A protein has these predicted regions:
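Extracytoplasmic metal-acquisition and chelation regions
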Residues: 20-294
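Bacterial N-terminal signal peptides
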Residues: 5-15
């Protein structure tokens, strides 16, 4: 997996995304989420009973080079509930949790709620089964921290799960429509969703190399380019937050071959709910696979 560089020194500037400090009311639960999509689920369930800081929150900048600030360190130290992806995707959070003073807190680790095994794709939020499990764990944590308002958390959990079920239903529809379609990607970011959709993913060795920040082999690059030039795939997916000369070249080859190209991100856009973000990406994918050039 790509190496994420994190500086824990107290006076190092944040180079990628500046997370605004959480100003919690006296009786609010203080929550810190490593990624903003988990923070969004916490807000949907917690409502005005929680104050949420999402550390990685800028979809316009690459998430693979990240440094933290004293403010973020302090917020994590004060958090009652911490939410992270796990799966070695955000291992910096473990370091921050261990660096501060020990205190009682609940840690919701998505990788421990699903059937994740070392070596599996770490982009767990793109698996439709992940967020419902995370939502239940978050609601349980809120109810334990604030039992007086447990009924409210339970009610909002039901609403959130119903919204997340729209993703499950949409995935089933698209699997019936496009299942088996050969596609490819520059990185495995969308891999869990592609698998759930029943799509046939090609050039996975290339994707693994890019995820691990290593140079793909000449053979794998040639195979990827050939798939595009010979139109052996119906779609190219790329990580729009991270690009280099090689991925840009592959995008250009795909466009010249009139293969649809769509971008996905590892960070959720601002001012949108998780379910709407994912459903929007699924709509874009459906349109691309249904088009005349697919």
């Amino acid at each position: 997996m790509k190496k994420i560089a994190f500086a824990l020194a107290l006076f190092l500037a944040l180079s990628v995304a500046q997370a605004a400090p959480v100003r919690a009311a006296q009786d609010q639960i203080v929550v810190v989420a490593a990624e903003n999509f988990y923070g969004d689920i916490a807000r949907q369930i917690g409502g005005d009973r929680v104050s949420v800081l999402s550390v990685m929150n800028n979809p316009d900048q690459g998430p693979h080079l990240f440094e933290t600030t004293p403010g973020v360190v302090r917020q994590i130290a004060a958090a009652q509930i911490v939410i992270l992806n796990g799966a070695n995707y955000d291992s910096w959070m473990d370091k921050l949790l261990g660096a501060g003073p020990r205190r009682e807190r609940t840690v919701v680790n998505a990788s421990r709620l699903v059937n994740y095994k070392p070596g599996d794709n770490p982009h767990l939020w793109y698996d439709p089964a992940t967020m419902p499990a995370v939502a239940v764990a978050i609601a349980d944590a809120f109810a334990k921290a604030d039992s007086a308002h447990a009924a409210g958390y339970s009610a909002r959990l039901k609403v959130t799960l119903a919204a997340l079920d729209q993703i499950t239903q949409r995935v089933a529809q698209l699997k019936a429509k496009h299942g088996g379609a050969p596609i490819t990607a520059t990185e495995p970011v969308f891999g869990p969703m592609a698998r759930s959709l029943g799509l046939t993913m090609r050039n996975e060795r290339f994707q693994l190399a890019t995820m691990n920040d290593t140079e793909p082999s000449a053979r794998d690059i040639a195979a990827f380019e050939n798939d595009l030039k010979e139109r052996k795939v119906r779609l190219l997916i790329y990580n729009s937050q991270v690009s280099d000369r090689l991925t840009e070249r592959l995008r250009d080859i795909a466009k010249r071959a009139k293969i649809p190209v769509i971008g996905v991100t590892e960070t959720m856009p601002a001012n949108v709910k998780f379910q709407d973000w994912v459903l929007g990406e699924l709509d874009v994918l459906d349109k691309a696979l249904s088009g005349p050039n697919s």
